[in-house]
């Protein structure tokens, strides 16, 4: 393990949106793997903690998030996935979050989103960005190998269940989730896929997801899941919400989205959710950071809402 001084220098460099060298990324990912392999599918988290949704390579908005919410390690953070793709700075964004995780392992929890996958990143920008910035795909491989180790969900004080997407018809209890083998590419279907892809819906029961992966789940499903598992709330990300957060399903579920003006054109606010020492909840909304000059990109990423 390198000394914290080395890591601190790397974090300082990354905070200026300057990517690490390829060799440093490899070492960083190896260190992160050693930490994440010890974490759980349902990673326990203590309060106070600030819960964050999708970032999607919007580096300067991540810096704005830290400005609003407080810097690590002064503030404990829980990120619910989707660090890469879409935005211009996926490399710098994921590098910074992983470096902070290695430096302050008990202060930062980083979960897996549906974009933390080999297949999705080859289509929606991260793979191309790695090629453009490093001249080869090695850094993409280091990070996508690391993504396999990210916890799938987190549980704040046994009360607030956090994950990227949503529930699964295959998983009635947290113990079902604990028994999954997560260290693999995100499958096309099945319980692990559902946790990263599903969405809440106005209709009751389970529905076919328009995304082509995961399911939609109704208020009846969320209420029963929370009751069965002694939960007060499901906190998830995965969907653009214009105010940055959105309560649904009789406040059994909240969506938190932390990429303001998503894709640099959606006009939405972002939000983060502060959970205090007595489990009190406070949403902080924020607008985009001042726009930087956009880098040239090799090709336009496809339009879609995943």
UniProtKB/Swiss-Prot annotation:
GO terms for molecular function: metal ion binding; protein serine/threonine phosphatase activity. InterPro entries: Calcineurin-like_PHP_ApaH (IPR004843), Metallo-depent_PP-like (IPR029052), PPA2-like (IPR047129), Ser/Thr-sp_prot-phosphatase (IPR006186). Its EC number is 3.1.3.16. It catalyses: O-phospho-L-seryl-[protein] + H2O = L-seryl-[protein] + phosphate; O-phospho-L-threonyl-[protein] + H2O = L-threonyl-[protein] + phosphate. Mn(2+) 2 binds at residues 82, 114, 164, 238. GO terms for cellular component: cytosol; nucleus. Reversibly methyl esterified on Leu-306 by leucine carboxyl methyltransferase 1 (LCMT1) and pectin methylesterase 1 (PME1). Carboxyl methylation influences the affinity of the catalytic subunit for the different regulatory subunits, thereby modulating the PP2A holoenzyme's substrate specificity, enzyme activity and cellular localization. Phosphorylation of either threonine (by autophosphorylation-activated protein kinase) or tyrosine results in inactivation of the phosphatase. Auto-dephosphorylation has been suggested as a mechanism for reactivation. The keyword RNA-binding does not apply. Pfam families: Metallophos. The active site is at residue 115. Its main location: cytoplasm. Keywords: Cytoplasm, Hydrolase, Manganese, Metal-binding, Methylation, Phosphoprotein, Protein phosphatase. It is an enzyme of class 3 (hydrolase). The modification Leucine methyl ester is found at residue 306. Binds 2 manganese ions per subunit. It comes from the Eukaryota. Mn(2+) 1 binds at residues 54, 56, 82. Belongs to the PPP phosphatase family. PP-2A subfamily. PANTHER family: SERINE/THREONINE-PROTEIN PHOSPHATASE PP2A-RELATED. PP2A consists of a common heterodimeric core enzyme, composed of a 36 kDa catalytic subunit (subunit C) and a 65 kDa constant regulatory subunit (subunit A), that associates with a variety of regulatory subunits such as subunits B (the R2/B/PR55/B55, R3/B''/PR72/PR130/PR59 and R5/B'/B56 families). Interacts with TAF12B. Interacts with SRK2E/OST1. Interacts with TAP46. This is Serine/threonine-protein phosphatase PP2A-1 catalytic subunit. The gene is PP2A1.
